[in-house]
């Protein structure tokens, strides 16, 4: 084997991109089967495949970064660029949902009764659960920043406390969102209002679940002393993602819950 004379990480062949793509296909097909035929077999298979892929891919990345030292400063720089581009792509993803919402609400068609919210839709009160959700996410933004500063100062105990609080707030937000969906007087099939509301807030809810999973992995890694004050990009990426989720919610709250009601 030739000796490596550069700082770049030559990644070994991995099956996880393939199994990840397969799980995405199974989940999207499974959602269609669930919506139209009330069958959960494909969706469950896709979710299990996705969870197994996440576990094994995270395990490999942790092994390469923490135990094999492949994440040199130049590799970390590349990962930072990658994470920034990923968050930009997510911003554009949500831009499409906001576009659909404003396109429908600023010039309501006669079929909607020429008004917004459409005739027959009883929107959620923005000063009840949505406002509580806003305060929960803003508080989690404060606690994740506290965790980050504690980590940079080498205060392990406070970092774990702050990270645990952030995860708890993320789970609480998800439970509040689920209860709100359960109690809503309209559904995703109630015209353009129902579809834009549930798709935009639902995808944001999915991002909160993904972000919470990301933070739980960081919490478990910190318990095992994986992070140092100057080598913790895994946590930094999770914190960036969480702040992005916070900001998107503020736009959702102001646009869909407050102005849209």
UniProtKB/Swiss-Prot annotation:
Q: Drop me one GO molecular function for this one.
A: cytochrome-c oxidase activity
Question: Which residue spans belong to the Mitochondrial matrix compartment?
Answer: 1-15, 67-72, 153-155, 224-232
Quaternary data: Component of the cytochrome c oxidase (complex IV, CIV), a multisubunit enzyme composed of 14 subunits. The complex is composed of a catalytic core of 3 subunits MT-CO1, MT-CO2 and MT-CO3, encoded in the mitochondrial DNA, and 11 supernumerary subunits COX4I, COX5A, COX5B, COX6A, COX6B, COX6C, COX7A, COX7B, COX7C, COX8 and NDUFA4, which are encoded in the nuclear genome.
A single GO CC term, please? mitochondrial inner membrane
Major subcellular site: mitochondrion
Topology feature Mitochondrial intermembrane, residues: 35-40, 106-128, 184-190, 257-261
Q: What does this protein do?
A: Component of the cytochrome c oxidase, the last enzyme in the mitochondrial electron transport chain which drives oxidative phosphorylation. The respiratory chain contains 3 multisubunit complexes succinate dehydrogenase (complex II, CII), ubiquinol-cytochrome c oxidoreductase (cytochrome b-c1 complex, complex III, CIII) and cytochrome c oxidase (complex IV, CIV), that cooperate to transfer electrons derived from NADH and succinate to molecular oxygen, creating an electrochemical gradient over the inner membrane that drives transmembrane transport and the ATP synthase.
List GO BP terms, alphabetically. mitochondrial electron transport, cytochrome c to oxygen; respiratory chain complex IV assembly
- Organism, as annotated: Hippopotamus amphibius (Hippopotamus)
Q: What is this protein called?
A: Cytochrome c oxidase subunit 3
């Amino acid at each position: 084997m030739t000796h490596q004379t550069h700082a770049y990480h030559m990644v070994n062949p991995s099956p996880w991109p393939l199994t990840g793509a397969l799980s995405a296909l199974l989940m999207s097909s499974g959602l269609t089967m669930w919506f139209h035929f009330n069958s959960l077999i494909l969706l469950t298979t896709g979710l299990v495949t996705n969870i197994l892929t996440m576990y094994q891919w995270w395990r490999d990345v942790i092994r390469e970064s923490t135990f094999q030292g492949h994440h040199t400063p130049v590799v970390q720089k590349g990962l930072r660029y990658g994470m920034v581009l990923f968050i930009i792509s997510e911003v554009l993803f949500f831009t499409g949902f906001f576009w659909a919402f404003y396109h429908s609400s600023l010039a309501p068609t006669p079929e909607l009764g020429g008004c917004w919210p459409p005739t027959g839709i009883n929107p959620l009160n923005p000063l009840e659960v949505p406002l509580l959700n806003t305060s929960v996410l803003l508080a989690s933004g404060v606690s994740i920043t506290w965790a980050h500063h504690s980590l940079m100062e080498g205060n392990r105990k406070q970092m774990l406390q702050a990270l645990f609080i952030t995860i708890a707030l993320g789970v609480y937000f998800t439970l509040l969102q689920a209860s709100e969906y359960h109690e809503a007087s309209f559904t995703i099939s109630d015209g353009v209002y129902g579809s834009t509301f549930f798709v935009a807030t639902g995808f944001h809810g999915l991002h909160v679940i993904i972000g919470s999973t990301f933070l739980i992995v960081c919490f478990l890694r910190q318990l095992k002393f994986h992070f140092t004050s100057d080598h913790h990009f895994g946590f930094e990426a999770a914190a960036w993602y969480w702040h992005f989720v916070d900001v998107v919610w503020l736009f959702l709250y102001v646009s869909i819950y407050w102005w849209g009601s």
